[in-house]
Amino acid sequence: MFFANALKDYIDQLNDLTILLNDNFTVFTFLKSLIIYLFDSIKFVFIYLVSCKWLTDFIELPCTFKSNYTAILEGKSILETNVTPSFFHFLETKPLTSNSFLTGFLNSFFLTLPFSVPHLLSLRAFLINGLPAGISAALGTILGQFTFFICVFFGFEGILIPFLTFEPLNYILGFVIVVNVLYNMAHKPNMEVLNKSQLTILSKFFGLNFVLSWTEQTSLFHYCGNLTFNNVPTLLQSAEEGVSKLNGITTFFLPNFLYLVGILLGSFLWTALLGFLFTIFRNGLSRVLTIPFMFLNDKIHKFIFVLTFTFCLTSIPYYGFDYLVSAPLGFIGQDRALEFFKAKPYYQIATPAKDKVYGEVFLNPIPFDRTGQLELQLSEKPVATFEDYSVDSENAWRNRQKRRPQNTKLQSTQTSRKTFENKERNQDQTFIETFYKSIKITEKSKLSKVEKDIDQIASKLFNPIAYDYYDQGMDHSPYTRKLFREKFYNNPVYKSFVHLDMISFLQGQPESYNLTAIDEAALYRRRFLLENYLASIHDYKDLILKKQTNNSYAENVYNQQFKGSLDLVRHYFSISLTSDINQFDSFGSLLLSDNQKTKKILKFDQPLYKNYLQESNPILHEELDLEVKTNLLQNSVKKKKTELFKKDREVTLTQSKEETEATPFYIGWDGTLRKFLVKKACTPGIPFGNEAFSKNPTPYLPTGLPTYLSFQSWPLNLNENNFKSIFDKGVSIPYTPLSKENALKVAELFELENFKFDHANLSNLLQNQNLPLYNWNILLGNSKDPLLPKNLNAYIDLGNTLPPQFGGFAWPGETIKLPGFLNFLNSNKNDSSF
């Protein structure tokens, strides 16, 4: 009878379903409901038997039999008496997250994303310190989160309440730990790969991440809220159950336990999956870009360091003043005692014109601070919403009166006054015409001195330049002008128009005038060198004005490196190419390299130059008449031809002479006069002081002498009296003889005893000493590639020389051709005056 009534009740339920579902009740729905009903019935019977509830029902049968029997006779459904409404939950559409274990497994994905400081440290330990370090750090993070979830779900008040009571000390503790970690990462980074045997270091990784998972609260999802796959507000809630159902094993402990197990297993699986993906990405990046692992690990370390430092800083403004300061002191949120800390949207400031007149300057309120909008507003004043101040267009319209310029009232009065004047202009027209008529001068008289002074003073006082009218408002804000220029110069449309304008201008001149980028760069380099050369000359002129010291000249100028060679010229008469010239090292490489191209600078100014040297006369202006220029050019050309003809005649007359005038000049320091001199003199025995010509023209040979040499003393002049006497004694003295003081120093240098200064014995004494010789290996035939033939060795041997004075360098003038020079030597071989 019981099963018959149960079957009847089931059919009644199906009839009710057909009425509810109407046309959606299909055969598939019927079979599905039948299978689920049978499965739930078997489960109900099985639980009924296992839980021994049948025993309690059998004991209570005398009490419940009457009510059940009466219900059967009355035709009531047996399901309404003994079966709970949850028995028919199979008819409801269950979501995927109705299973607590699956919900915890899916929600654990958000707990493993590397968007918090503990996860970043775990990722760094895995990628840099190896797999054991990564497992230890990740295990500390996961267990720290899992223990916190256990304390929250099962209500361990002995742990949570003291922990939450000490806020914000727990946050400060986590902040201090993170700062310490950042300091170690910056100064003592651990870049070694760890193994399983280093348990001490691995335990530090585990403990650090475990503590940070409880105390450090920095995460990217602070501003996004808690992300979950179910419809509950936070991750700390497994299902939406009522308070009355939180006291059973099946309704509370079992779902929460399954939820926590899902979180634990999901955290391990998602962490392993993310670590595997990061490893594949790092290896692929290193393989594709051919980057070494050491370099890539260093970049990963720096990136995680910067990201951790950023998270550490962003946590401070997130918690704010209320959480960190006012809440521990006992203040509540929006406490009236702290109103003076709140930002006000209006500030009253005194204008510089009037001290007692105040103007209101509007500032946007703090975002999301709507406490002022909750206050009671007057009926006359409309309530302003947050959007009225956040949107620029609405903000400008709300504050249109406050943005009105200060001279609005003045302009309105001027406008009305002008309108009034226009109405009465006809009445005053005659007066204006007569007033502006020019007055004829009847008498002329000279101005007095007072009147002239008044005119001069008035011209100065009432000059617009004196009041700087033209520059008014331009120089007050140079930063505004800079922004104005950047705004236009960064505009691509403006840049394209300027570019087209300049190109059209440059195309209007001849094509030969357009320099290439390399030509412009070379021209700029020459200008720069010439500028530094002229600056060095000015610096040299100011040397005599420098303050004299008690130190010797050598110690003061040359820093105890006074040697008397070419260093003297570098120190004293150097072309001071400053350190700015170093920029041309890379600049010159651009000119020579093929891979890099020198970019041309777009500008209006172009250098003026001639295609030919005699194209125009530099004295005449370029806009003079062409005929005048051509006549002057022809006259100048004729004059140059006559001068060249005269010079050729003089050259032919001087070809028979033994020696021409001394064309070379010498630059150096004169030790006797203590002056830096530029002199003309010839050096006996050295071919650089001669310039010879041959009557018979000979073919030109490319081999020539060098165009400069370095010398260590000054050469002798031809008209000195003792030149011939000294030269006859066989000593080569190509410079001025030493003074008495310098000769004594030379004697001390060579340890000459009983030395007396005399020009006669000076040569004899110094002739017997082993003095250093001039190094002429480059010119003589001893080297591999001599510049002169071997038959000239006898004419360039200087023999013994006197100890050097102060040196310099010499320039012989034009390059000497060897055939003419050989003829000159053959004709003057035995001449002693040479």
Swiss-Prot record:
Coiled coil (residue ranges): none
Record carries keyword Chloroplast: yes
GO cellular component: chloroplast membrane
Entry similarity comment: Belongs to the ycf78 family.
Region (Disordered): 397-424
Keyword terms: Chloroplast, Membrane, Plastid, Transmembrane, Transmembrane helix
Subcellular location as annotated: Plastid, Chloroplast membrane
Its membrane topology: Multi-pass membrane protein
Residue ranges crossing the lipid bilayer per the database entry: 30-50, 101-121, 125-145, 167-187, 261-281, 303-323
Name used for this protein in its record: Uncharacterized membrane protein ycf78
Compositional bias of kind Polar residues: 407-417
